[in-house]
Amino acid sequence: MSNENHEELNDQLIVRREKVDTLREEGIDPFGEKFIRSISPEEIETKFADKSKEELEEAAIEVSVAGRIMTKRVKGKVGFTHIQDRFHQLQIYIRKDAIGEDAYAVFKLADLGDIIGIKGTIFRTNTGELSVKATEFTLLSKSLRPLPDKYHGLKDVEQRYRQRYLDLITNEESQNRFVMRSKILKYTRDYMDNQGFLEVETPVLHTIAGGAAAKPFITHHNALDMELYLRIALELHLKRLIVGGMDKVYEIGRVFRNEGTSTRHNPEFTMLESYAAYEDYEDVMDLVEGLVSTVCKQVNGTTEITYGEYNVDLTPNWRRIHMADAVKEYVGVDFWNVTSDEEARELAKKHNVPVTEHMTYGHILNEFFETYVEEKLIQPTFVYGHPVEISPLAKKNKEDDRFTDRFELFIVGREHANAFSELNDPIDQRERFEAQMKEREQGNDEAHGMDADFLEALEYGLPPTGGLGIGIDRLVMLLTDAPSIRDILLFPTMKHRD
């Protein structure tokens, strides 16, 4: 921005503050009080759309509306303004002789961005525009800063994220997206409730960072003089509830991971996790398929959507494929017949798949999948049979114990859900935790730690259980065609300005 523009902005700030002083000298509060609205601009739009000019004149319908000034024209003793409320605009016709000299003087001082209240009657102009003829004018809040240019809005994407309030005022698409986010959350809860799940709340502060492979945020509790972790998953507390006899539970809550940011990652994000006793991962596939397709139909009116360049059909029944079969299909490498870690490493070297010291057969299979397959799964696909090495909380597959009864859901090349038949053998679970701790010693800083309290809970008996985790933010991105996670978080985490 040039120095000239800086001066212009400063001048506007000064002039608006001078108007505040002028109003106060006249005994008028520039930041008014409660204003009772009888109707919104949107309701006027829909309720009176079919009424003629003559019908409205005869009815003389009195209303009370409020909104933000988006346009203003004054010519002598007459003025026009458009007010906006949730992106529905309404024209207001203001005459000096109708609202009084004092109120008209206040109107003349009003700026774009000011919030006003109007009482008056509905009429239709000669051009056919529904409007309100003001009989009373009230200044409700003086805007001390000018809004972004109405024709260009906020073009700086980073400014949209940092100043979401301006984005919501000037960008209807953005506001609609957040309305849809709220609806997606509501419909998700409705679906889970209708399936017999009970919504619960579990702690955000954990004594051990468990339930996922991720780096935690660490804090300190002064009174107890102990380190605590912001939760990286909801899982381990919810499974304790299944032990306690709460057969079907779910939680929608924030989780925190001290990792990088991208178009798909934010350090804090929203997860849905659910657990159902006496079920397995195949039951959870059915749950996910029903949930996502139902919510999509409710918010979009169809299960066929567009995401970026892709046309996606979320209509059940979705494809289901074992991870080893997916790698064989897309890469041509048959991990079913790989018999040793050394053979897996040789294949990785041949196909330019990066490996580190702690990686064994299962890690390498997963690396093949993530490198060559994941991004190609555009239509909804359940990939199941994850290796045991990367699934420390999942039940081993009884036919091939190299794999687990786990799946991930991929749509447009991205993971949207993770689920498994929960590991309920406390002895096996302890051994998995110990293996994870060895990995940590070898350099895998995302490996699980030992959770003795969770192991003790398992020893009382966890019934066979199907567990699920869905990233709500990615689901919202998918259903609203949002290119970045920052587009569907009201206030995404941002680096400090320089």
From Swiss-Prot:
PROSITE patterns: AA_TRNA_LIGASE_II
Domain of life: Bacteria
EC number: 6.1.1.6
Alphabetic keyword roster: Aminoacyl-tRNA synthetase, ATP-binding, Cytoplasm, Ligase, Magnesium, Metal-binding, Nucleotide-binding, Protein biosynthesis
Keyword flag Magnesium: yes
Biological processes annotated in GO: lysyl-tRNA aminoacylation
Annotated GO MF terms: ATP binding; catalytic activity, acting on a protein; lysine-tRNA ligase activity; magnesium ion binding; transferase activity; tRNA binding
Record's keyword annotation contains 4Fe-4S: no
Gene3D superfamilies reported in the protein's UniProt record: Bira Bifunctional Protein, Domain 2, Nucleic acid-binding proteins
InterPro entries (alphabetical): Aa-tRNA-synt_II, aa-tRNA-synth_II, aa-tRNA-synth_II/BPL/LPL, Lys-tRNA-ligase_II, Lys-tRNA-ligase_II_bac/euk, Lys-tRNA-ligase_II_N, Lys-tRNA-synth_II_C, NA-bd_OB-fold
Catalysed reaction equations from the record: tRNA(Lys) + L-lysine + ATP = L-lysyl-tRNA(Lys) + AMP + diphosphate
Quaternary structure annotation from Swiss-Prot or TrEMBL: Homodimer.
Annotated family: Belongs to the class-II aminoacyl-tRNA synthetase family.
Descriptive protein name: Lysine--tRNA ligase
